[in-house]
From Swiss-Prot:
This is Putative pancreatic polypeptide 2. Belongs to the NPY family. The gene is PPY2P.
């Protein structure tokens, strides 16, 4: 479950970065 949470947060972070660029 911890790995899935990390993967989800990484996906969310990359989405935010993509929106900012």
């Amino acid at each position: 479950m911890a790995a899935a949470c990390r993967c989800l947060s990484l996906l969310l972070l990359s989405t935010c970065v993509a929106l900012l660029l």
